[in-house]
């Protein structure tokens, strides 16, 4: 037997253990296995940067599930991989390129930039995989996937080809969210609003040839005056009188239910509306009539005639009652433009500068164009008031720059049927979402059935597999189509084509475009298509398109692989709520479309980890904790157990974040101010250290502080407790002989341990099945620490030293440790594997009632199954009371500062039934509480010099004789404090029970419990008062 170290040195042991698992292929899945399958796909981390604790939580929870299923006999596949994260990764690399070399992607060119991004990907993928491995994730590392690798790429091409053939993919000109920094469209889900200080500009457009009595100008207002260069109309409401009436009716309806303060405000609004009706309504009616006559306005600065139109988008109750219409740069105006058949004039280049449609302002950036347009309007005398105003500005989540609505040609996925299929899957519970409250967000998002814009104007990603040529006459398009049909015969199932409208030529004749989709990445097919004059689309696909295929693409689809047959659909998905719609919903609809089955049957949405200030952790904020920093300080098992213990079903987790001074190891709380500093001085030792924000050579030369959280201290202590108790057990197994045991004849403490193991096994298994990881961790912690280590091991010590009892005691305690290691292994894999290895050298054959050979790894051992025949509720109740009494005696000893070597006389008043339960336990009070029980039962009375604790939950009073130990003044102080606490509690209960409303409305059983609780408190108070009198008589 190898020597058992006094400490578990995770830094030395974890890598050895992980390598042993790898060498034994413990986590490698066999698709030919006869075992039932259980598969999980990892939410692939983005290669934008390293992982933080949010990823740590996500992967720990997945690993708990996977390890337990592996131990339960399933053929488990946990598919690892990373995501290319198109827009996010390109944004990071482009920003770095600009900061370090003052270059743009256009300076480098497509191929060179993509090479740079591949280098970034390789660097961070290696780091991410390293982090995951050090956390102990038991993925099948031989099957590592990447969303841009050839296997995933084949699935992307096959999916796009299928949707194109079904006409579920189409090209259209739509208003998109345009990121001018990255020069690409971003989805609505990648946009956030930020409040900025801005202005509301009022200016006038001249009416062309106004008739007598007609207004000469129409006044409009906007926060974006530069967009007026793309205006194609001004709208007025078609029935302004009715619209104002409707607004007033709404206000009066609110008034009927308003309080006094609200009523004042509403009456002011009604008065203002009535005044507006008098002052503005006649002109609005006049403008409405002018619109009906087809009258025109002159757009200043570009001298373009624009329409005056009647449309309900105009709000007569606001501003002038008229609204400028810029269909190419505002989503609402775009809808007006569709309804009114207006021209759509895009005034922006892709980089956010004004294009030729901006006339004299072409080439200016948006801020400069805004100032120039306002100045030009002022010079023409057309500028009105300029109001200060706070404005909600949309920003790109990727580049953090303002979004511009932008009219562009994009590829879309038609979502109607696909979205409905994903909704049905959740509605009929083929996919269940836990907690169930997240179902609504999933269904609401899909119910909008918004078509999905999937093209991105980027260079990093899956290039859209479409080749096209436009500007063709119908005859030219038909001739080209015929050539493509011949080509398709030469390349079966590889080419799909479509002829679409493409606008008009210089003569005003309609033109056509031919689009070809190629299924596979085949240079020969692509060359043949390009030889016909078609060119590939330069755009790439939205990252989420490839991510949506992850559960089946990673298994080799569209090829019918053994892995796909065995492991699809996967069993469960564990992820964050942030991507429930962006990713989870799309995986469901793509799985149904491609494979015909849902990709998983259950989805668990885990809480988010927040810092101590309640903010989401992220590297960009400086509050993101690297799991490796926690592992280096506390160990991987402490990281995992700490995270599992925090994983609740209902709320996000706050975790205070600290810097660890590299000089004195003092933890310094992060604040919003210091978390952004490049360096700082430690408030404890005064020595400087750098942070992740260090940029100057001076800062970088300082030792760097790790970012950690003290919340893992308790978990590290638990690891140490488990190791120490395990070491004690194994050191007392000399001469171990596996023995068949008759459970019924075992000593009571052994039967208690077996019963508790059965109960805990059932509770932990149920909790993990319900994704209640925090509950599983809590139960295991309490059992391991309080019951196995602190109670059972202590009780067993005398028997382990007694030759006549040692063999049975060794067999039972070895079995108890064995079962505890199996239960804890999914959460704490490294320390349990290390103990298992040592235990296997001492007791390779063990178990109760029948010993059996065990394998070399706890990772592949069977997970415990609750043995109902071992369950004994009477014994568990015995020990529960016993534990509470021991705790009470220990509390009294501590309060009196009684030395550990001293034995105290104790008396225990309890019911006759409790006396029967506790009588066999009296011998153990000496070992566990340093107490000699002199009296036990209903007639037990207090000692003359008595310390007393009541245990109302079990109707027990614990008395300790303090004649030899008492500090009268200290004990009086303690009792008087307790007397005050009890008096306060009694007053509260009496007030509650004297409240007629509570007594009459609360359920009868609740009222009765309150009365019983009051009676118990009053009994305790009487006993404390008697104890006080006794002690006072000794003064």
UniProtKB/Swiss-Prot annotation:
Gene3D superfamilies: HUPs, Isoleucyl-tRNA Synthetase, Domain 1, Valyl-tRNA synthetase, C-terminal domain, Valyl/Leucyl/Isoleucyl-tRNA synthetase, editing domain
Coiled coil regions in record: 253-281, 967-1035
Entry annotated with the keyword ATP-binding: yes
PROSITE patterns: AA_TRNA_LIGASE_I
Source organism superkingdom: Bacteria
Positions that bind ATP: 619
Pfam families, A to Z: Anticodon_1 (PF08264), tRNA-synt_1 (PF00133), Val_tRNA-synt_C (PF10458)
Catalytic activity, as annotated: tRNA(Val) + L-valine + ATP = L-valyl-tRNA(Val) + AMP + diphosphate
A GO BP entry: valyl-tRNA aminoacylation
Entry keyword set: Aminoacyl-tRNA synthetase, ATP-binding, Coiled coil, Cytoplasm, Ligase, Nucleotide-binding, Protein biosynthesis
Motif ('HIGH' region): 45-55
Location (main, coarse): cytoplasm
Cellular component, GO annotation: cytosol
Subcellular location: Cytoplasm
E.C. number(s) listed in UniProt: 6.1.1.9
GO MF, one example: ATP binding
Keyword Metal-binding on entry: no
Protein family per UniProt: Belongs to the class-I aminoacyl-tRNA synthetase family. ValS type 1 subfamily.
Role according to the record: Catalyzes the attachment of valine to tRNA(Val). As ValRS can inadvertently accommodate and process structurally similar amino acids such as threonine, to avoid such errors, it has a 'posttransfer' editing activity that hydrolyzes mischarged Thr-tRNA(Val) in a tRNA-dependent manner.
Domain statement: ValRS has two distinct active sites: one for aminoacylation and one for editing. The misactivated threonine is translocated from the active site to the editing site.
Subunit and partners: Monomer.
Protein's recorded name: Valine--tRNA ligase
Lineage, uppermost ranks: Bacteria, Pseudomonadati, Planctomycetota, Planctomycetia, Pirellulales
Gene: valS
